A protein has these predicted regions:
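Basic polycationic patches enriched in arginine
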Residues: 2-5
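Short beta->alpha transition motifs characteristic of CBS
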Residues: 60-67
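Helix-adjacent hinge/juxtasegments
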Residues: 71, 75, 79-116
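Zinc-dependent deaminase
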Residues: 16-44, 105-175
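Short beta-strand scaffold segments in enzyme catalytic cores
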Residues: 49-57
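Small-residue (primarily alanine) positions within well-ordered alpha-helices
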Residues: 34, 38-41, 51, 61, ...
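Short, basic and Ser/Thr-rich N-terminal targeting/leader segments
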Residues: 45-49, 95
Length: 175
């Protein structure tokens, strides 16, 4: 296998290099980017969940949880990434886009994913308490809705889980 450097646009005017084999950006590569964004949230004392939206090998939207800093229960990583992506392309319909998020989306975010017409969802760790894409509920797999054609969990799920567990361990230690 050949390894080569691939430059991808992560935001307008911002590029990053991804080392990959055979020139393909893997789901794990994209999830690593979402994990990096989640880490930024952790540094800002937010629950470390990060999300990116990819269209034609470019990140067109990203976000991390900001519920605490914005005093907004809807400021989840997925919601902020969807808003950013919609603003980037000038359309609320995110057809042919993939969402990478470090934790299984909740019911609110699953509804937004369906409503925004996102084609593929890849998430890190499962959420047995609030997950709505296979754990507690399966909104994204419900044939009643026009759901994403691909829903895949456990993409670097262990890394996502460790990040979240580390955050809550440190929070409890402060108390």
């Amino acid at each position: 296998l050949r390894t080569r450097r691939l430059w991808v646009q992560v935001l307008p005017g911002v590029h990053m290099s991804i080392e990959n084999q055979l020139g393909a950006v893997s789901h794990e590569d994209w999830m690593r980017r979402a994990l990096s964004i989640a880490s930024k949230g952790m540094r800002e004392d937010e629950v470390p969940i990060g999300a990116i939206i990819v269209y034609k090998n470019k990140i067109i939207g990203q976000g991390y949880n900001q519920c605490e800093s914005l005093n907004d229960s809807t400021a989840h990583a997925e919601m902020l990434a969807i808003t950013a992506a919609s603003n980037t392309i000038g359309d609320w319909r995110l057809t042919d886009c993939s969402l990478y998020v470090t934790k299984e989306p909740c019911s609110m975010c699953a509804g937004a994913i369906i409503n925004s017409r996102i084609d593929a969802l890849y998430f890190g760790c499962y959420d047995e308490d609030f997950g709505a894409c296979g754990s507690k509920l399966d909104i994204c797999g419900n044939p009643t809705f026009k759901t994403p054609s691909v829903v895949r969990g456990n993409v670097l799920g262990g890394d996502s889980l460790v990040l979240i567990q580390d955050y809550f361990f440190k929070k409890r230690k402060k108390i």
